[in-house]
């Protein structure tokens, strides 16, 4: 069992290293710029004391526009050097050393896609968030050109690894082929099971995953076309969820007396009725006909 866990931890670390390396490419930088623009407008509306980011894509960070008092970056590997104005913590995402109900917002930039146990990470996010806290997710859209390209390179890398085990798989792929892409619908279902309400789902980066910066600049018109037409599938999506906590409202009992049957006294206490019958002599509790017969 220990060997199995160590194997998955090694795969997760390897995936994050490859993702971080991919974000230094021209395509990665173009996507990162779109993700920062999508987050900046959102973070300006998030207030509180503590903001946590699980996973780091580059040394610039994604919390530049945050208005929270404290920002923390939690990673599962060696942190990026010279990350400005953020405190670092290296730990496992499945067991966060954070108190319950102590974080106002959590950012997960593709975190669920490159971790072995996304369900446990979501449970940890639900645990550390305060009531009405925000969870912000960035993800790749599997039903887009990015998803098809990811699947293609995933299969190609698998075949290449069988033929040449010494060749690094990320040398072949123009985008991070590791990990498992999670659709908006699946993530929404997971969050609703944990008691979250979905506030916002937006999409970004409608251009295909082309490694050439020149071609990406020429296809800049696809961004506006995708936002207005709603036909082109976007490469990435932003999902915002709010943690809801149900509370019990105590209801004060209402005491009142109700009218009962003649000869009995009815008392109603907190909705419970009780008939109090008088202790009558059986000889007096006879009908009129029976009394006449006895008199004769």
Can you describe what each PLM-predicted range is?
Residues 134-171:
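Conserved class I S-adenosyl-L-methionine
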Residues 152, 177-201:
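Short alpha-helix
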Residues 197-222:
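Conserved catalytic loop of SAM-dependent methyltransferase domains
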Residues 2-45:
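Class I SAM-dependent methyltransferase Rossmann-like catalytic core
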Residues 94-106:
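A short acidic, Gly/Pro-enriched loop at the edge of an enzyme's catalytic core
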Residues 37, 41-96:
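Class I SAM-dependent methyltransferase SAM/SAH-binding core
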């Amino acid at each position: 069992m220990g060997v199995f866990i160590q194997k998955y931890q090694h795969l997760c670390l390897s995936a994050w290293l490859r993702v971080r390396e991919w974000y230094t490419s021209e395509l990665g930088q173009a996507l990162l710029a779109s993700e920062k623009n999508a987050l900046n407008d959102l973070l300006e509306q998030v207030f509180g004391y503590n903001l946590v980011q699980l996973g780091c894509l580059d040394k610039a960070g994604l919390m530049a526009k945050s208005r929270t008092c404290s920002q923390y970056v939690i990673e599962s590997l060696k942190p990026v050097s010279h990350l400005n104005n953020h405190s670092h913590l290296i730990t496992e995402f499945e067991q966060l050393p954070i108190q319950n109900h102590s974080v106002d917002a959590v950012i997960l930039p593709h975190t669920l896609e490159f971790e072995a146990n996304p369900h446990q990470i979501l449970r940890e996010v639900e645990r550390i968030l305060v009531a009405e806290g925000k969870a912000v997710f960035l993800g790749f859209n599997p039903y887009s050109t990015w998803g098809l390209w990811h699947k293609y390179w995933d299969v190609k890398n698998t075949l290449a690894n069988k033929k040449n085990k010494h060749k690094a798989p990320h040398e072949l792929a123009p985008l991070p082929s590791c990990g498992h892409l999670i659709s908006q619908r699946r993530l929404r279902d997971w969050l609703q099971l944990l008691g979250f309400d979905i506030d916002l789902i937006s999409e970004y980066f409608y251009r295909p995953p082309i490694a050439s910066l020149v071609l990406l600049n020429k296809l800049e018109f696809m961004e506006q076309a995708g936002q207005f037409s709603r036909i082109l599938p976007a490469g990435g999506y932003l999902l915002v969820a709010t943690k809801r906590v149900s509370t019990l409202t105590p209801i004060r009992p209402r005491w009142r007396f109700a009218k009962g049957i003649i000869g009995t006294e009815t008392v109603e206490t907190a909705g419970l009725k009780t008939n109090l019958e008088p202790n009558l002599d059986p000889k007096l509790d006879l009908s009129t006909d029976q009394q006449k017969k006895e008199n004769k």
